[in-house]
Amino acid sequence: GLGDDRPIWQDDVPTEKVLEKSGKFISKAYQKEKDIILAATDGKAGHFTSTLWMEGSALVEKGYLKFPEGVTMVFADTAPTQLYGDEYDRVPREKDGKYGIYYHLQYYGCGPHLVPQTGLKKLYYNMKLAYDKGDRDYFIMNVSNVREFVFELKAYAESAWSMSRYVPDDYLNRYCE
């Protein structure tokens, strides 16, 4: 299934107190990490991200995990399905926050590897969902084999730069011209 990438509590369901303590601990670690980076770069580092997936999303949703100011919160799809989990809709967005997405076109563990299968409509669905949510500050895509995924890579780039231009059928026609 999901390989080794899983929440810290997958095999042992924690209490709310444990979740709260975990969130506070991780929040302090994020702040310390940002402070170290800023010190090491004489304050020149200007872009910070944190990718939420499973436990990160759950801790943010409950208000236990807080990020330092200026950190872009990045939401990841569940790689095998290439869809966002239920937590995607439940995590609150702050008015002045920065948000983005991490999306898989390819996944070694159990998704497409040599043959693309995401399809333009699924890609459109996910990109439109992110765009409509306001998660537009950061886009990153995971694809391990570029050669087999050029068609989808171009579609992803086009939709990230101009969602209004990206219509699956129109893209297909332009690509084939």
PLM feature spans:
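Gly/Pro-rich turn-and-neighbor structural signature
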Residues: G1-K95, E177
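Structured mid-domain segments that build the active-site/substrate or prosthetic-cofactor binding neighborhood
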Residues: F75-T81, E87-E177
